[in-house]
Amino acid sequence: MSTIKELYAYRQMIFSLVKKDLRGRYKGSVLGFLWTFINPLFQLIVYTIVFSKILRNDVDRYYLYLFVALIPWIFFSSSITVGAASIISQKDLVKKIYFPRMVIPISYVTSCFVNMLLCFIVIFAVIIVTGAGINFVAVLTLPIIMIVEYIFALGMAMIASAVTVYFRDLEHILGIVAMAWMYLTPVVYSKSIVPEKYLPLFNLNPMTHIIDCYRTVLYEKQVPDLTALLWAAGLGVFFLVFGAFVFNKLQRHFAEEL
């Protein structure tokens, strides 16, 4: 509880770091802020061509099926990979002044989250332009799904950022892990093609349920399965608590290691 109060007291610092990251992310580039939309759109085009044209995926409106899963996945993977280096990238700040170190991974994950929210504008534009339709009752559950994903991503980012201070290679390893994790999550394919004997393993992955919930709302236009959402939320809270525990244990010697 004391940690939450302290973080609340430093909320302005979190907002400032989020603004700084968003402004500095594409500083100096010609297209600047537009890269927020160009990167996921380019990935969407590549995956759509590969899976719907070359590999003959027969999913109806595959571009939409993929897009509503790809944007949340990019948020999650970016939170881990960018979050892993967050403490190291702010080492001067860590050495000079006191503040709750947890502020740093929180600000980086929040910055990635804001990027995802902006990309959702494009998702809704695609849905409207293509006439796919929207179930407004189902859309009301989107904030809950987003919060569940944010909690899980933050927990993982806390662990990654703290451990990376002591083991710098983790930052590079996580890039490989994120790529493998994506293919173990039904982002570019349907869970229905997974052999039944492997389904229990897939269902242990919180991102499987989170991606399913996004698809149920935005692609199938239905209210998501409450059981799946609760399972993902439970795992998300577990990793958040565990991540905070690991972070608090390791943060004591950040300054010396940096």
Task: Identify the residue ranges that each predicted region occupies.
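Hydrophobic transmembrane alpha-helices and immediately adjacent juxtamembrane helices
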Residues: M1-L258
